[in-house]
A protein has these predicted regions:
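Active-site-proximal helix/loop segments of hydrolytic enzymes
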Residues: 1-130
Length: 130
């Protein structure tokens, strides 16, 4: 976590003791990793209706671009261009559209269930039905 103090997102770490800042950052990252896994499960569930999955579970990796301490992040693999069947499907516009719609549905479903505070979705979910 200490390597990310320069990339603390919206966390209030400026002027804090370095040890305290590291603890706050580690706590935020742990929460964000859990949220990222939930988001990944939501997207993977939608993709399983569209294409064969290489892995039927969400995997974790330490990609630097996926380490924002305050934003759930996922990397979606939709196929391998080195695989002829995958490559053929990825060249098909209809298949790409279905993949995009599945990814969108997974992201949308995740955020509808867990709307970020102060967001449009949070405001919608706070309104009484009717």
């Amino acid at each position: 976590g200490a390597d990310l103090i320069g990339n603390s997102g919206n966390l209030p770490l400026q002027g804090r003791d370095k040890v305290l800042a590291g603890v706050i950052l580690d706590m935020a990252l742990s929460s964000t990793i859990a949220s990222s896994l939930d988001l990944g499960h939501s997207v993977l569930g939608q993709l399983s209706d569209v294409t064969a999955l290489h892995q039927k579970r969400v995997e974790q990796a330490g990609f630097a671009v996926l380490k924002s301490p305050d934003i759930p992040s996922i990397l979606v693999e939709t196929g391998f261009i080195s695989n002829r069947g995958d490559c053929r499907r990825l060249m098909d516009e209809h298949h790409r559209q279905r993949l995009a719609e599945a990814i969108f549905a997974g992201v949308q479903g995740y955020f509808r269930q867990r709307p970020p505070a102060g967001s449009y979705l949070a405001a919608l979910s706070a309104q009484p039905p009717g």
